[in-house]
Amino acid sequence: FFAAGVGAYHVAMFHLFTHAFFKALLFLGSGSVIHAFKDEQDIRNMGGVRKKLPYTYIFMLIGTLALTGFPFLSGFYSKDAIIEFAYLRNSSLGNYAATIGILTAFLTSIYSWRLFFKTFHGSYNNKKIPINQTHESPIIMLAPLFFLSIGAIFAGYFFKETFIGHHSNDFWNGSIFFLNEIKHSSIPLWFLLLTPILVVLSIPISYYYFISNTNILEEFKKTNSPLYNFLLNKWFIDELYDVLFVNPSKKIGSFFWKQGDQGFIDRFGPDGISKLIKKLSNKAGLFQTGFIYDYAFAMLIGLTILLTYLILN
């Protein structure tokens, strides 16, 4: 969406393509970790299982490197292309987008390495499951990770020219609009190096704060409790979303369900018809007394009505 927003539709499709490999790799790798921890999903209850899950560790490392845009992996080619294209718009909006893109890439690297380090490094923190009960996943689960890791490493390099290279017009065949003055512009070296440098720096920074010196974060919790709670609750976006969208949708749905579905459709439709048929069948059942003289009397009344009709006509 970032790339499409700055008009880099071909880059957006390229990132969607590379993103599929390393994001799927991370999702399936997370599943392998959850399997090892017997369905535990909180990374605060993990840690120190690098040697217990060696293959999952390697695949998650590859996926994390690719996601953060580490140089020469798939994410590096597509992520940098997005930021570069925003910079080349040569406008205030383009510069703003490029700045936000660089900051986002750095923060993405921080939280990605936080996930990786707290899962595999540091001390083991699960009190319910002994570390000797954690185990590597079977080959049937690891095989897809292997193939996805190949794409996470090489897909960006081998398909860059096809999607966004100088001859990419031949691939898109006019289906995507290109700004030629942007496509053939140059980018200063410092800008090209800025994002990769920040991505690489995020590795020791994350390890320092989340593994080596966790007391810094503990101190931050104590001294900045309101801010910490605000961040811990994800800016209360979920609660705000509930108030603005979920709860009103529930009320509207409940109204139409009770007044429309139950109050009208069911009342005059299936439920109403079935009740009417049941009532008529109960009335008809009153004539079935089981006594011969009642049936003979009914036949006599019917015969009298029939004869009267014939005589009158």
Describe every region a protein language model picked out.
Residues 37-73, 95-104, 129-154, 228-229:
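Interfacial and helix-entry/exit segments of alpha-helical transmembrane bundles
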Residues 70-83, 87, 157-178:
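Membrane-helix interface motif
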